[in-house]
Amino acid sequence: MILERTIGKAGTVAVGEFTPDGKLVAYKSNEAFSNDLAMMASQFAATVRMFLTTMAASFSHLTGLPLVPYQGFIFSGGDMSSVIRQDHWAIVRTAQSEFTPRGGAAERGLEELARLPGVRLAAYYASEIGEIECKQSMSLSPEVRATATEIVASTTSALRGLATAFEHLSTTRWTPVKGWLYAGGDWVIGVSPCCWLLAHSGEAETNELHRAVMR
């Protein structure tokens, strides 16, 4: 069973199974983690999955790249990280987990990010002004990149709001946003508040990409 396999991973606080409409099926924890909180985590997981599926469908329509169906999501903020797969969620303490950035990862520049396995586009951006600089080995036009960057920035803002809400429910620190990653279709999007990557899932290593964008 997936819960038994994942509860033993380093840094794991709790893992759970949920239905598409956000109902808790089962959960296990390594720390004090109430049933009510597990129910809320399941509601958040279903909400995030539906929201990201909508975002990815829009991104696919814009770029012509298949980013659906949804495959998985990683979020890191404050002291915590979460993973949401098809019908399972996990909550971990980032510093004790595989998502901890390795030495120098947070200092990677745009050229180095663009050379990561599978990466086709790496860009710096600011939510107020859009794209600042971009390196790509694909042919997305400046207009398409501008809209894609706006989608990425607005998604980050929405996830920040959800993280703030869960922070108050769980009494653990989920903000500021450090990075998030979406995998769907044939592609992976990795995002921090200042940069984002687009990588082909057949070549990319998702945990490495997530660590690379974390700030």
Descriptions of predicted regions:
Residues 1-215:
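Non-catalytic interaction/Regulatory regions outside core domains
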